[in-house]
Amino acid sequence: MAKTVLVTGAGGYIGRHVVRALLARGLDVSVVDLRLDEVFLRARRVDVDLFNAGEDIYDQLGRPDAVIHLAWRDGFVHNSPAHIDDLPKHYHLIENLLKGGLKQIAVMGSMHEVGYWEGAIDADTPCKPASLYGISKNSLRQITALLASQYGAQMQWIRAYYIVG
């Protein structure tokens, strides 16, 4: 049986490419997004409001082996108050997934967590975000690491730089 992966934000620019790559590897893929304009014929669409689904969200999503959490609002509006407003929603989603039994979660971060930095950047570069977006993403990274440790899950943080296409 193929590994099951759920992708949040599957209809976004990055999400579409992630879903295609996972399907090409023969994985069983489920997708969630507010807007799924593009049809993923081999992916299972899950119609769930991620941020209002309750504590049993993991069951509602079909208990996938892994979740790739890409969903985010106003990513290109760096000082939108939506970043701070939505942070608790992301926290509760991730907590409820892990509490429900999820053992592997990957979350999309951003170069904006690091802030302004000259020189090479690696996993040990200190984060000094300079926008509400960067502050929120950095906070979610720290929260997710704490929750993954608490629930014995594997956490992977994906930090993207200069997405073009």
Task: Tell what function each PLM region has.
Residues 92-132:
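Conserved Rossmann-fold NAD(P)-dependent oxidoreductase catalytic core, especially the SDR/UDP-sugar
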Residues 8, 32, 67-70, 105-111, ...:
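SDR active-site strand-loop-helix element
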Residues 5-25:
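N-terminal Rossmann NAD(P)H-binding glycine-rich loop of SDR-like oxidoreductase domains
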Residues 50-88:
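NAD(P)H-binding glycine-rich loop region in Rossmannoid oxidoreductase-like domains
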Residues 41-53:
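Rossmann-fold cofactor-recognition segment
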Residues 130-156:
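Active-site Tyr-X1-5-Lys
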